[in-house]
Each structure stands twice: as C-alpha cells, then as structure tokens.
Amino acid sequence: MSYVEVPGAKVPIRMWADPASVEDGAMQQLRNVSTLPWIKGLAVMPDVHYGKGATVGSVIAMHGAVCPAAVGVDIGCGMSAVRTSLTANDLPGDLSRLRSKIEQAIPVGRGMHGDTVDPGKLHGFPTSGWDDFWSRFDGIAEAVKFRQERATKQMGTLGSGNHMIEFCLDEAGAVWLMLHSGSRNIGKELAEHHIGIAQRLAHNQGLVDRDLAVFISETPQMTGYRNDLYWAQEYAKYNRAIMMALFKEVVRKEFKKARPVFEREISCHHNYVAEERYEGMDLLVTRKGAIRAGSGEYGIIPGSMGTSSYIVKGLGNEKAFNSASHGAGRRMSRNAAKRRFTTRDLEEQTRGVECRKDSGVLDEIPAAYKPIEQVMEQQRDLVEVVAKIKQIVCVKG
C-alpha cells in the first residue's frame, strides 16, 4: 500500500498502515511527538503499536534535537542473519540436540559468560576496531562505569523477551542462521541515565508527556548522550556478531561432515539514531522499531517464533525516511497474551519448531503478533523480498 497522512498533525505523519487499526494510545503518542518544534516529519510502519517512550514502528526525523526515551532502553537492538551452504537434506530428524548445543554456547535470559569471550579465538571474526571500541568505555557516563565487568561478560549473550536465535530454512531448502538482540544491560543503564537527565532539563518541563524530553544540539547533555548512544549501538552490533560467531561454531561442529560455508552476514539495527540528510537538511533520525531501507540495502524483518521471516532489500523511499518495519509488531500486550492463551495454544502454533513451549514464553506466542504476510504487503513500496525463511529451531531467553 502507499502511505496515508494522519489529519490534524502539525507535521506530516505518513502511515503505512490503516489508521483505524492503530490503538488510540499509539495515535496519541504520534500526535504528541508531532508537536515538538524540532520535528520535521514522522513515518509510521505497518507493525506500529503503542510502546514505552514512543510508538513502536515509528521513524522520527528531528533537526537539532533527539528524544532519548524514543530510542528506548535497548539501544541498538537489531537482527543478524547469514545464509549457509547447508540444506534441508543435511538435517537430522531430531533437532533437540542442536537447540541444546546453541543454548550451551550462548547464554540466554539474564545469563552471561563465565569469562569474557576472546574474539581472537573465534573463527573468522574481524577483530579490527575491537580494542578501540573497549578503550572508549572510559569516555562513557561515570554513572555506569562500575558495570564494565558485566558488560564484557554479557558481550555475546541473548537476553530475553522477543530476543531469539533461530535455525531456518528458505523456500529453496537452504539453511539460514538468524538472531535478534541488543546492547544488553549496559545499554539499558546508559539509556535510563540519559532519559533521567533529559527529563530534568528546564526546557523539558511542562510537556504533555515527559517521554518527549529532548536533548538539543550543541549542549553538553546532547554531546554526552550521543557519545554514549553511539557506543551502545556499537556494543549491540558486536554483541550480535559474537553471538553469530558462536552460533557458527556450533553449526560447524554439529554438521562437520557437510563442511558448512557461510555467506556474508546481514546485520541491521532497529532501535537507534542515525545522522541523515533529507531535502537539503541534516536530521537526526530515530528508528524506534524500524530498519533502514535505503536503495539496495539489505535488512531483516522477522515474524514470530512460529511464523516466517523475511530477508529484504530496501527501495529507498524517502517519504518513509528510507525505512521499513522491524517485524510483525504486537497486536496485544504481553500480559494480555498470557491471559488469553494457554501452553496448549503455544504448542499448536509452534508445531514443527524445536523450541520452548512452556508458560515462560507464552507472551511470545505467534497469535500475539500481527500476521507477518499482511505487514509485508503493506510495505511493498518500501522493500522487496530477497528470501522468505521459516525457523525449525528457535531459542528464547
């Protein structure tokens, strides 16, 4: 579908979704954001839903300001995927061992590595920039520096919620590895620290929503936030890269006879800020549950733990600030899903997938999400599909 504009907003709110299908709370969030004087436009993706801090599935383009609560607490959260030389014919009948080996190699939930992962010992891992990245830890906010040991041991770990590690097949029978994670606890603590600072600034008093608090360019607070933000985004990228390297090691060992080969990795953030230029103006673009989809750029749009996901290539639609959805998008809250569904429903909806089917992941049941096929149909002018993949193993935290 092409976009529709939300009427009555102070700046263009272009929506790649049916406005009637969007919760009132999410619509109010969007209207509130549009009132900020630094806003130059909003693009709303088809996976849109109400979110903490800002609407999930929104792209917020601002000149000279950024809203830290809109980025959220999982700075740099995103996806990585890689196609392998393995095919369905290489797979064993029982995939439970593979799932167990993945869970042994990559800590999930609140878990962390007993010792810091040495990237130099990971097959093919590009270590250039690694030492420089960690040297910049000395320059981040003093309030979180005591977390350095935890940050190093959580590097290469999954987390919980909708984060996952999946072993997938595409329609041609090729095996893909895919995972979803972010900046772990260090990103959360940095985000909360800066959100608190923003909400105490004089120019942010009296806002209709305290989550609209912004940092303004050329101020010490903005400089500090952007320094920590970009470091956390890099942490998230490294976190996924190390997880993927550990995942590949498992696959090499489990499929030793097949001698798997891995293609170039695709990686994309979907909770982050980027400096981009539109209509001759330098903007700070916040993608809150959205991926960049510039012309020819690869991206990953996952479904849920029982549905398909998509590898895509961007079409470079500037009306959407070169963006696309980050997934299917929730259609009910986690608590609502737990009240409505049972573990029997979860078993039914994840049939054929080697995964957890207990009450601890009931809030991730596929029916709690919008139909991914509908979401993809609504953004045909934002991305083209490169591959449709479906998980056969799913690891959750």
Predicted regions and their residues:
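Compact, glycine/acidic-enriched structural inserts
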Residues: 78-117
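Short beta-strand-to-turn element immediately C-terminal to the catalytic PLP-Schiff-base lysine
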Residues: 59-61, 82-83, 312-313
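N-terminal cap/recognition module
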Residues: 64-85
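Domain-length cofactor-binding catalytic modules of enzymes
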Residues: 2-29, 37-41, 50-56, 65-68, ...
